[in-house]
Structure formats: C-alpha cells, structure tokens
C-alpha cells in the first residue's frame, strides 16, 4: 500500500486536455507508472496554435479552453 502514497515519482504515458477549471483547461497525465524517466513527470500546455498538451519535467500549464481542440 506504500505504492500509491507518493505523487512525486509518477510519470506520464501521455497527456490530455482536462476541462475541469473553465475557462481554462489543464494538461494532466493519461497514465502513470512507478518507473519512468524523470524528464516526463507532468504535463504542460504548449503555446502552439492550437495549444497541445505534452510531457514535461515542469509544473502543469494552462491555456484558454476555447483554444483547446482535441
């Protein structure tokens, strides 16, 4: 049961657009794993047009939900 206690060591298999905080969307992990590269431990929203969610080693990013096409 000590496997789900820490949220610091999770990594993303992919990122998706989660509209849980309108008028913004958040980039969140699709799946998490116990063992994975530290360079992919969260998701961020790119400044492309339209914005996309991608793996990153930085904190989560947000973009206007109106520009989220996925």
UniProtKB/Swiss-Prot annotation:
Record-linked Gene3D superfamilies: Cysteine Protease (Bromelain) Inhibitor, subunit H (2.10.69.10)
SMART domains linked: BowB (SM00269)
Entry GO MF terms: serine-type endopeptidase inhibitor activity
Keyword Kinase: no
UniProt keyword list: Disulfide bond, Protease inhibitor, Serine protease inhibitor
Summary of the function given for this chain in its UniProt record: These proteins inhibit trypsin and chymotrypsin, having 2 sites of interaction with trypsin. The site of interaction with chymotrypsin has not been determined but is not independent of the trypsin-reactive sites.
Protein name: Bowman-Birk type proteinase inhibitor A-II
